[in-house]
């Protein structure tokens, strides 16, 4: 947790009920299962906020509707909404989402992480930073930042 909270009293929302995957149309074990919006949301919903003991879903930083998937073109976009427009943790949140998806999805997927329009004071700079491969790689070479990201990611079951 970070001292000197940016948002001392965030609104905590009820969690959405988890839906079970029921698609049994693919019976061939060699055929890859399509990836959909719900699967992506399930990967990121339990990421912890770097500042609070709550998940990104609890704080509505991410919602199922904030996920777009084009499985045919191997493209995923997650648009997240920081709890305050001057959130200093927005870069860390975006990096957590990216790392979780990089670890969870096949490497063929292009992952696009965005801040919701109008939700952050430095929206354009954040979007550029979160989608610049060299900046992301440099960030992931920083052991302190990697430790912070790993602390936010849910443990694998």
Swiss-Prot record:
It comes from the Eukaryota. It is found in: Nucleus; Cytoplasm. Changing residue 51 to K: In ae7-1; leaf adaxial-abaxial polarity defects, highly accumulated DNA damage and activation of the DNA damage response. InterPro entries: FSCA_dom_sf, MIP18, MIP18-like. One of its GO terms (biological process) is iron-sulfur cluster assembly. Disulfide bonds: none annotated. GO terms for molecular function: vacuolar sorting signal binding. Keywords: Chromosome partition, Cytoplasm, Nucleus. Disruption phenotype: Embryonic lethality when homozygous. The keyword DNA damage does not apply. GO terms for cellular component: cytoplasm; nucleus. Central member of the cytosolic iron-sulfur (Fe-S) protein assembly (CIA) pathway. Involved in leaf polarity formation. Promotes leaf adaxial identity. May play a role in the cell cycle progression and is required for cell proliferation. Belongs to the MIP18 family. This is Protein AE7. The gene is AE7.
């Amino acid at each position: 947790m970070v001292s000197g909270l940016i948002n001392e009293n965030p609104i905590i929302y009820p969690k959405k009920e988890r839906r079970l995957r029921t698609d049994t149309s693919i019976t061939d074990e060699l055929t890859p299962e399509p990836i959909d919006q719900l699967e992506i949301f399930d990967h990121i919903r339990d990421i912890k906020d770097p500042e609070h003991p709550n998940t990104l879903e609890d704080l509505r930083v991410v919602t199922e509707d904030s996920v777009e998937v084009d499985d045919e073109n191997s493209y995923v976009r997650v648009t997240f909404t920081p709890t305050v427009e001057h959130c200093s943790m927005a870069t860390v949140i975006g990096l957590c989402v990216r790392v979780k998806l990089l670890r969870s999805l096949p490497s063929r997927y292009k992952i696009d992480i965005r801040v919701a329009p109008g939700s952050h004071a430095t929206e354009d700079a954040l979007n550029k930073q979160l989608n610049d491969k060299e900046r992301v790689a440099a960030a992931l070479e920083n052991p302190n930042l990697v430790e912070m990201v790993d602390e936010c990611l849910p443990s694998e079951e």
